[in-house]
Amino acid sequence: MKKFFETIKNIFKIEELRKRLGYTFVLILVYRFGCQVVLPGIDANLLASFQQNTQEGLVGLLNMFSGGAFGNASIFALGVMPYISASIIVQLLAVFVPYFRKLQMEGESGRKKMNQLTRYLTILVLCIQGPAYMAALHNQIPGQAFVAVNQLGWSNFWFNMVSTLIMMGGSMFVMWLGERITDRGIGNGISLIIMIGIVARFPHAIVAEAGEKFTTTNGGFLMFIVELVIWFFVVVAAIALVQAVRRVPVQYAKRVVGNRQYGGVRQYIPLKINAAGVMPIIFAQALMLFPLLFARWDSTRGLAATLGNYTGFWYNFIFFIFVVIFTYFYTAVTVNPTMMAEELKRNGGFIPGVKPGKKTVEYLDSVMSKVTLPGSIFLGLIAILPAFAMILGVNNSFATFFGGTSLLILVGVILDTLQQIESYLLMRHYDGLMKTGRLTGRSGM
C-alpha cells in the first residue's frame, strides 16, 4: 500500500503528466456542466416521463453514451454517438471499399483524410438524429413543457430547427473536447467522455440499490455486501477478458550492419481474445429492435411481449447469439491476417515452423478463429449478466454495472488511461502502477 501511494505521488512529480491530467480534468468538468444545461425553451421540471423512457434498450444505450444528457434534453443530448456511428461506417468502408483501404495504408496523410471524412459523416448523422430526437421529445413529454412554443409564440418548426442546430453544435463541441483531451490530455478523449458519463451514474445506482436492500423485506445489509462481492468478481472477469491475449511467437532474421547485429530475437504477436471490444454488444442491441418491430404485426401482441421482455429467456438467448455472431464479424473487420503477414515479411520476421506468405496468413487466421470462439462466448455471457442480476432482484440502475456495455467500457477505458500513465512513469524511471510494469490496454472501442 505504501508503494502504491508513493507511485501516486510520483505521478504529480512529472510536470508534463501533471499538466495533462489537469487539462483533462478541466475539460471533463466542462462536459459534465453542459450535460445539465437543458435546451432553451423547454421546462426541465416536466421531463420526468421522457427520462423514464430513456433507461432501457437502444435508447438507454444512447442515454448512457451521452452521460444522461439524452434524457435531460440537454444541449449535449446527442453526445458522441453520431461521431461513433460515423467512425464505424468509415471503418467498414476501409474494409470493403478499395479506395478507403488504400487511404488507411497511406500513413499520416491517409489518417487525416479518414478523420476529415469521419467529421463530414458525423454532420450527416447529426442531421438525421437531431430531428428524430425532437420528434421523440414531442411524443414523450407534455405540450406545456415547450415554453418557447406556448408562451413565446414560436412555431413548432422554428423551435425544432433552432433546437436541432443547438444540439448539432453541442455534439460537435463534445467531439472537439474529445480531440483536445486526446491531443493535450491523457487517454482517448472520446472514450473518456463516454466513461465519465457512465461513472456519473454509478453513485446514484449504488444509493438506489442500498435504499432497496436496507429494508426488512429485501435482504438488508448482508445481501447488499454479497452483491458488491459478486460485482467485484464480475469486474475481475471483465478485466481478464479485456487483457487476455494469445501470444504468437515471431522470429526475426539476423542482419549485420557495420559492426552491429540486428534481429535474431524472438518476439510475439499478441492476438487479443476479445479484439472486437464492446462493438458486438452495441450492434446486437441495435439489431434487437428489429425482432420487436416485426413482432408488432402480431395481432395478439404475445410475440412483442416475449421479445420485449429484457429479462426473458428468448430476448437474452437471441441477444447472446447476436453478440457471438457480431464478435466474429467485427474481429474479421478489424484484424487483418494478410496485412499482418505482409508486415512480418517486410520486416524480416517469420513464425517458427510456418512458411512466410499464404501459409502465415492461414495460420494467423486459424489462431484468430480459435481464440475468438471462447472470447465471443465470454463476451455474450457478460452481455446478458445484467438481465440475470435484475431477475435476482438487483435494482435496474445497479444491474447495468454487472456486465454489458457499461462494465466493458469502464474497464477498457480505465486500463487504457492507466497504460498511458504507466508509460510516463517508466520513461522517467519511476515504478509503474503494476508490479510488472506491463499494463495492457484495449485495441479500441
Where are the regions that the model predicts?
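N-terminal cationic and glycine-rich segments that engage phosphates or anionic surfaces
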Residues: 1-104, 109-445
